[in-house]
Amino acid sequence: MLVVALDTSTDMLACACAEWTATLDGGGVELLSHQDHMCRRHANVELVNAVDAALQDAGASMDKVGAVLVGRGPGSFTGVRIGISTAKGLARGAGVPLYGVSTLDASAWTAWRAGVRGLLGVAADAMRGEVYPALYSVDEDGPHRLFERERVVKAAVAVEEWSSRPDCDELQITGDGLVRYAKLFEEAGLMERVLDRELWWPSGEGLLLAAASSRVMLHDQSGDPAQVLPVYTRLSDAEENERKRLGLAQSAKSEVTGVADELAGRHLQFRPMGPADAEAAAELEATCFADASHTPWSPQQFMSELASDAAAPRSWWVAHDNGELVGIAGGMAIDTDVEILDVAVAPDRRRQGIARKLLSHVSYDVQMLGCTTASLEVEANNGTAIALYESLGFSRSGVRRGYYGTGADACIMTATLPLVLPVDATSPEPTAAASRPWPLPEPRRSDAERRLLEESSLVMAIESSCDETAVAIIDAAGRMLANQVSTQIDFHARFGGVVPEIASRKHVEVIVGVVDAALEEAAASLGLADPVAPGELAAVGVTQGPGLVGALVVGVAFAKGFAFAAGKPLIAVNHLEGHLYANLLTTPDLEPPFIFTLVSGGHTMLVHVRAWGDYEVLGETLDDAVGEAFDKVAKALGLGYPGGPIISRLAEDGDPKAIDFPRAMMHSHDYRFSLSGLKTAVVTYIEQEAAAGRTIHLPDLAASFEAAVFDVQFKKAWDALKQTGAKEYCLGGGVAANPHLRELLVRKLSRRGVRVTLPPQHACTDNAAMIAEVARRKYREGDYAGFDMDADPNMTL
């Protein structure tokens, strides 16, 4: 079987092709070609072309590949995601298995191939003064791990651990961590047996040898590309900081004076447990298990679970509503298994998906800490709980007699992580891929169905610029056959905004599942029984920018791998142009010239569209974007995230003239915007009312804030229409979904003889339908991108 191996977790782009032959002990590897080379910060530009070159050197092509192998890290966060996203795209586009292997193991096998034998230490660079340390015993059969799982430590700690070993004089060291921390190792006398510098990085052959030895291609992994995830050794900085903050918190409730009462009960929210939750958690436990054999936990037990010096890592989450704790779940990570310690949901809040959401968050945390399996005990007669766990992928593996007391047995259940959690807009949980046979069978098509697909010229588009993973499929006539979105709001809400690190992780986890859902939906729209296959598409479009760079690279890398493997052209799409084209979903006959206002979380701009592709940006915001201002005001009020929809709902019952907030730059005689002054005015008002002991009437504040923003938007738009002579006006961006802004613009501009086009509300926030419309037109014009395309976070119109 022909296998392509790749890794970009370090500055080395490792890429190789080999013939793999199954054997009883794992497999034999015959290296055919390699394209290993240093590519610092250019992996996303060079990787697909390196795969192409390696295949050509091997006298093969992608349609001959039987499997793809990828390094899962640990390593550079961005590098690992580029490699895994590209590999997922290659495997899904070609319909072949994808397998993952530790980059540390690949480095050890690279040393073995060079003749290294004995005690070997790999110190991979983890940045921030840290390394990923790994010790191996290397003999003629290969490297053997002397550690349970990957971890991250300060470089000085690794040096101390290794230099204090009684056999340290036998230790040979390698790894790209030596580039940054050589002095530390040298001062400890560990550089005397350092390997040659060219061996400090993993090679393509090392990946192949590591995979063969670990039997990953002999049923140790399913081969489903949706299931392959990076090796993470720590939570994101935002998550770590949040845990520290909660550890110091005195109360889990909102302390915003004057608004707490009005906020109570507006949202069911999920967040990590803090010490302030211990009493309520114990009370909830006692209520939930009042009639069970299980002994409820005490507040002291919960406090000990949250201690920073706990012997094993913990993850505890709570669900709260109306200032009341309504659910808890927690687990303890031991080696690569998480033991689920407790799950409890208030009796009147059951069957609402709360337990599933809580377990999804616990599962996600421990996956980031290296866990690959989960286990738990549940009362054998608790059929409801057992059914829930079975739906998540747990299976019964044993019984503990009398575990909860005489005659009260415990059913032992185990599961492989990630849990079976559906990927959809209402359940944005980690890696929603259910276990399934892979590769998928070839679709069965009649001649008429094949003609239909060929005539339809289906274009698939991928959007990943921020916190939505979206995929849409459009036909040649502009009919939207599929439109799938997986949102991450639950994972960012507790931080009051999008955390780029988490957004990037989530895209990697769900992108295959969202693509699968779109291919199935498109088939159903065409009346086909089997999902659309990658080879039945005409082209693949993807958002190139602007956006969060870590989020963009996932979509771009996946799309490039997918298009290359499927043999389809690649189309680069400007996200801002996508928001403009979203108006065509409502008004297909829309033609320039017209004025376009973009109002989103990242952009506020006024554009004169002279022709398709010919855009004059008349003015932009000098500081905060409109959506950003909404989020910041909502955060100041303790309303939660995202702020736009919450403020909009409050404003429905408010008086827009109740508070006279400033209209910044309304009479500046240009098309620039500024929102920071308005934001400051709102915060000042909140502080003044709090100091006076007055309760803030949130609907009035929300309506007055909206009016201050929207009055300026209308004034600038009308001035631009008069200056340019345009008779049509369009709106776009997440804030374009606001019903009050839509009504105001239609009412005021229509009476002035302007035709107003608004995108469908579902197409205002980030989605792939608008990207698909741009990609369809570019496909028709033959406007394709090369496989050296990279994400452009600063792209402009």
What is each of the regions a protein language model found here?
Residues 246, 251-260, 531, 649-729, ...:
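A contiguous, well-structured pocket-lining segment that forms one wall/lid of small-molecule binding clefts
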Residues 183-188, 218-223, 445-465, 472, ...:
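A short helix-loop
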Residues 366-377, 400:
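Conserved GNAT acetyl-CoA-binding A-motif
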Residues 272-276, 282-348, 359-369, 416-418:
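Acetyl-CoA-dependent GNAT
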Residues 259-276, 411, 415-431, 435:
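Conserved N-terminal entry element of GNAT/NAT acetyltransferase domains
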